[in-house]
Amino acid sequence: KKYGACLVGLTLDENGIPSTAEGRFNIAKKIVERAEQYGIKRQDIFIDCLSLTVSAQQDEAMETIKAIKMVKENLGCKTILGVSNISFGIPNRQALNNTYLNLALGAGLDLAIINTEDRTMVESIYAYKVISNMDKGCLDYIKKFKTVSNDNKTKERKNYDNLTLEDVIERGLKEEAKDLTLKILESHDEHFV
């Protein structure tokens, strides 16, 4: 409180991490009540409902999601989660992490601890904000990905000589599709202008 910092509360106690959403919620409630005794506002409290690896505790994966929802609906504070913990020790971690991130966001997750180098995780957050109407007019999404889209089209334009007409059309390269169509027509009909 003295320095204006936020509080992060982990939903574990002397008995460890509860296996149920209700158990984690009860710990979160105690954390919030104790923090308020010290003058910390709910808006400055982040509750971590703790994600555990599905390779060891698969039954608890959805309990974390339920706990996030319970905290958001009943305690009026924010939530935080180390999303990639879910996939530790599992191949194709990216697929699990993205799916779990989307479930957590849907339950009310406010702050995701993720690998920001994993582009698909960042893309998922921007997409979620559009779909959930948090990004009004899709402004942040468009700003973030307009350049990416244009960069991809520029790269594809440079290499379109190696692509078939079907490939060019599937990639949405209108100018290249037109040019390639004219090229194909010219090569098949000497009288085509």
Locate the predicted segments by residue.
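ATP-dependent carboxylate/acyl-activation modules
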Residues: 1-43, 52-80, 84-193
